[in-house]
Amino acid sequence: MPIIMGMDKQEANGTDKTLLVFNCHEPWVYQLNALDYKLDIIVGLRGKYNKGWDYQMRPLPTRARLIGLPEALRSPTEYYCIIAHNTTDLLDARSRPEPRLIVLHHTLEGRIQEEHSSIDPDKMKEMLHTYVELVGGHVVATSMFKGESWGFTDDIVHFGVDADDYPPYSGHEAAGLRICNFISSRRQILLWDFHERAFEGLPVTLVGHNPDMPGVEASRDWNHLKQMLQAHRFYIHTADPRFEAGYNMATAEAMATGLPVIGNRHPTSPVKHGVSGFLSDNPKELRRFAKVLLEDRGLARMMGQQARKTVMERFSLACFKHAFLRSIEIARRKWRTRKVAPSSFTIDDLPFTNCCR
């Protein structure tokens, strides 16, 4: 696997600590760039739609290299911490002798819904709690909404977005934008029937990996994605409050660019109705709001500026860096309290949720 060029120069200027990171959602992994650690990112994982790094979503972090799981397991590097995203990752890394943490990116209910699983959610929570306590692991949730779903609310670390990474809003293209992967398998979670009723016949651009949807493609790269965000009039996010949060990283990116957001009402939505976007559970009303923004670029720009302020206040990359560095130190302390070695567990000891793959 390739090592990113220029790493030696970066190593001379930064920390020598290295994290072992299972690949997950590339935009989330990319923000680890802010930590200024070296990153060994494990690719070629079972169940992930692509075998390498998805450069259509993000470039590789500056101090990162890509490795396979076998290489990671036999690496002589003393990793400062292992970053996992599901129980499969935890068990795959069970032979490694370093501290570890798992990041919860989804609600338990959402994963069960998407995977059509018959597992008892209470049993799943109990087993994960028991496992991390025994092996001295640490759990980080990306929002309180997701942490409460799993019963882990002690360490909430919101993702970070640097608003300065995004070009200023134009909105010259009178169309809505939605970025989403694998819509067909997540229709209920995304309230897709509601989305279709609200926006059918209106100019809306869908972006993402959706091989069963003709004409829908992922961005060419991050710069192309930024250009699309800059050009479109507003952004769309709909989600079932039982399964999914009222925002995601793409929503925050859109807000950072200065797009107002349109969607259903959700207790966790960062959108303030009538200020930074429009929210409604009535598809006809939401459609009317969309038409207002399509016809009034000035209003869209004004509301988008409020959306941008919200992102800068709530999803600062500096705050993410501070919080996640703290999470790593907590994981290192907990590792010293482990009761059993992770290697004592087998593949049959935990039910699996391939949360990000």
Task: Place the predicted regions along the sequence by residue.
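Conserved acidic donor-binding segment of nucleotide-sugar-dependent glycosyltransferases
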Residues: 273-284, 292-297
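Short alpha-helical segment that forms part of, or immediately flanks, the ligand-binding pocket
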Residues: 226, 248-256, 269, 275
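Conserved catalytic-core segment of nucleotide-activated headgroup transferases in glycan assembly
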Residues: 41, 149-152, 160-222
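A charged, aromatic-enriched C-terminal amphipathic alpha-helix characteristic of glycosyltransferases
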Residues: 284, 295-337, 342-345, 351
